[in-house]
């Protein structure tokens, strides 16, 4: 009997405890649970915001890095084509557009001489690729041989600076003539300033009255004189095959400007090149004649590394 009473009392105590717990304890547990859930939601929102900020900054970075390619793509595929009186054969047009597309994040320039008339050039409108790429540098023929001077050089030299182009001057080398006289002709004609491109030696012909060793020796004389005058190694301009066959073993230390008009993605797969003249039939907005168009294999900051201090 007493055992039954004890069981009854224990049951009543447990029942009373359960009633107390049901009234008071769930509220505290629920509040704690709600706080935990709320904290988790806040943490989740914070993580989402962090991910959003990272994604947003990444998109800005990618957009900035690829802005030139985006502008080029839009201009070539969605923008109405700018009118120009000049035309190229379809194959040449496609080749030029493909190269420009590959290097659309690089720096483009032109080279001109007295063959381009003054009245044919609008210096304020020099662009390519349907207006999406500005011409940023220009190479001007200054001298030829021991006494030749380009008749438009002085005017083009001043005008290119006024229009904030990085300007460069080149000497057309005549292998039959004395290299010292040729170097002096260039130095007397061209007064390079800070921000101008290094002097450029244009080599296109081999001599008939000299050996190749004598020819290379003469070139080194010109380069040495001009380098001593400006304190920087001149840039060598020549054709791909000419460089490969006659120059590459002796002039590897000089910045290289290659001309190659073939249907290729690079002017040379072996030589380390800085500039590529990829067409002599370039159609440039602002010029009414076809011109040589070049690409520098780098950005503006790197191009300025090839200018005089």
List PLM regions with ranges.
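N-terminal Sec-pathway targeting helices
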Residues: 34-57, 64
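Functionally critical loop-and-helix segments that line ligand-binding/catalytic clefts
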Residues: 26, 79-116, 121, 251-309
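Substrate-binding cleft of extracellular glycoside hydrolase catalytic domains
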Residues: 94-121, 130-219, 227-229
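Membrane-interface motif at the C-terminal end of an N-terminal transmembrane signal
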Residues: 59-77
């Amino acid at each position: 009997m007493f055992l039954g009473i004890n069981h009854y009392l224990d049951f009543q105590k447990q029942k009373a405890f359960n009633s107390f717990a049901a009234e008071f304890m769930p509220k505290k547990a629920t509040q704690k649970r709600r706080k935990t859930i709320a904290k988790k939601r806040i943490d989740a929102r914070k993580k989402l915001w962090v991910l959003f900020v990272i994604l947003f900054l990444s998109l800005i970075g990618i957009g900035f890095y690829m802005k030139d390619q985006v502008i080029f793509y839009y201009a070539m595929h969605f923008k109405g084509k700018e009118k120009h009186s000049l035309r190229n054969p379809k194959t040449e047009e496609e080749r030029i557009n493909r190269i420009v597309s590959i290097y659309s994040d690089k720096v483009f320039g032109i080279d001109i001489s007295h063959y381009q008339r003054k009245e044919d050039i609008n210096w304020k409108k020099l662009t390519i690729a349907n207006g999406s790429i500005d011409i940023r540098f220009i190479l001007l023929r200054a001298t030829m041989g021991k006494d030749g001077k380009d008749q438009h050089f002085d005017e083009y030299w001043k005008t290119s600076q006024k229009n904030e182009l990085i300007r460069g001057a080149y000497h057309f080398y005549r292998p039959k003539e004395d290299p010292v006289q040729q170097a002096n002709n260039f130095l007397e004609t061209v007064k390079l300033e800070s921000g101008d491109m290094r002097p450029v030696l244009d080599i296109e012909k081999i001599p008939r009255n000299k050996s190749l060793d004598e020819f290379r020796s003469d070139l080194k004389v010109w380069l040495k004189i001009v380098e001593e005058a400006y304190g920087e190694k001149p840039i060598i301009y020549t054709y791909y095959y000419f460089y490969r066959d006659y120059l590459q073993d002796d002039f590897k230390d000089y910045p290289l400007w290659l001309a190659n008009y073939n249907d290729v993605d690079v002017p040379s797969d072996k030589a380390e090149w800085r500039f590529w003249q990829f067409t002599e039939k370039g159609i440039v907005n602002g010029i009414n004649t076809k011109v040589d168009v070049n690409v520098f294999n780098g950005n503006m900051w790197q191009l300025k590394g090839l200018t005089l201090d």
